[in-house]
Regions:
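Conserved alpha-helix/loop element of class I SAM-dependent methyltransferases that forms part
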Residues: 60-94
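Short alpha-helix
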Residues: 235-258
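Conserved class I S-adenosyl-L-methionine
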Residues: 190-223
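A short SAM/SAH-binding and catalytic strip from SAM-dependent methyltransferases
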Residues: 160-175
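Core SAM-dependent methyltransferase catalytic element
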Residues: 251-253, 267-286
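A short acidic, Gly/Pro-enriched loop at the edge of an enzyme's catalytic core
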Residues: 149-162
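A short glycine-rich, Lys/Arg-flanked "PGG" loop and its adjoining helix->strand segment in the class I
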Residues: 175-190
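Class I SAM-dependent methyltransferase SAM/SAH-binding core
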Residues: 94-151
Length: 286
């Protein structure tokens, strides 16, 4: 009996060791996918979301485009609260850059209001949607498939407005994004940005318990990496207010206005806990 007990213990130990090694191998395989750059993982993830009917990948309708031409319109930087019209002002003849703003949702509205629109997005599907709406409505759009974590492919001081909806949660270094937005804006140009605060990244998937230590960075923490992979969430990063608003100030912007918003669904939304910030900032003449 003693021999059998030892044999069972030994076999059990071997099996546990084997399963552990297999699990570690699978994690390594997933990490190796990410090592082709987190930006490319996010590109593939968002392309897949668009194909699955993602809310922020559905192009605006013809009726909404016509309504905008008649002065009735709304666009979003965050999930539920429309951008105040006075934040944008008269758009006739204005040059707008939609930064990580593809999908055919905001740029068609701005075109209908008379703006000269350029959009940069790393998602192929979001860029396809821009061309789809432009062809349907008969206007030209400069739509560029590009990565905002790199130097933007534009000269200095050429845009009047940079419209940047929630998206820098997919970027590890947000300071670079704000610096580039400042560079491509004209003097007195405006940056409109939708921003995550840290709250979405401290809670579990049910939004009931605080489980994550900040900052949330899957490139530096195995547990958060596995969480992102399991949730089909791409690679996301938390950014605090120092990074999000302080980063704009550090880039040279002057903060003009601000509002908050919720997720639009889920327990945090039901509790009216604000998880997003929208900012209006200016590149004032010095």
């Amino acid at each position: 009996m003693q021999f059998r007990s030892r044999l069972f213990t030994m076999i059990n130990s071997i099996v546990k060791s084997w399963f552990t090694k297999v699990s570690e191998f699978l994690v390594v395989m997933e990490v190796s996918k990410i090592m082709k750059t987190y930006q490319d993982i996010n590109k593939e993830t968002i392309d897949r979301w668009v194909e699955e009917g993602w809310e922020w990948g559905k192009p605006t309708s013809h009726d909404a485009y016509i309504s905008a031409k008649n002065g009735e319109w709304k666009v979003f930087l965050t999930p539920t609260f429309p951008v105040p019209h006075e934040w944008l002002g008269d758009l006739k003849g204005k040059k707008i850059l939609g930064l990580a703003s593809g999908g055919g949702q905001q740029m068609p509205i701005f075109n209908a209001l008379g703006a000269d629109c350029t959009v940069l997005d790393y998602s192929s599907k979001q860029i396809e949607n821009e061309f789809l709406v432009a062809e349907r409505e008969g206007y030209n759009i400069k739509a560029i498939e590009g990565d905002m974590t790199k130097i933007l492919p534009f000269e200095n001081e050429i845009f009047d407005i940079v419209f940047h909806p929630v998206s820098n949660c997919y970027v590890e270094d947000v300071q670079h994004v704000f610096n580039e937005a400042y560079r491509v804006l004209k003097k007195n140009g405006i940056l409109l940005a939708g921003l995550n605060n840290e709250i979405n990244y401290i809670v579990d998937s049910e939004e009931r318990e605080i489980i994550w230590r900040m900052p949330f960075n899957p490139l530096k923490d195995k547990a958060s990496l596995e969480y992102m992979i399991k949730g089909n969430s791409g690679i996301q990063f938390s950014h605090n207010i120092t990074e999000q608003i302080g980063g704009q100030l550090k880039a040279g912007f002057t903060l003009l206005d601000i509002y908050e918003d919720t997720n639009g669904s889920g327990r945090l939304h039901e509790m009216n806990i604000k998880t997003y910030i929208a900012t209006k900032s200016a590149k004032l003449s010095k």
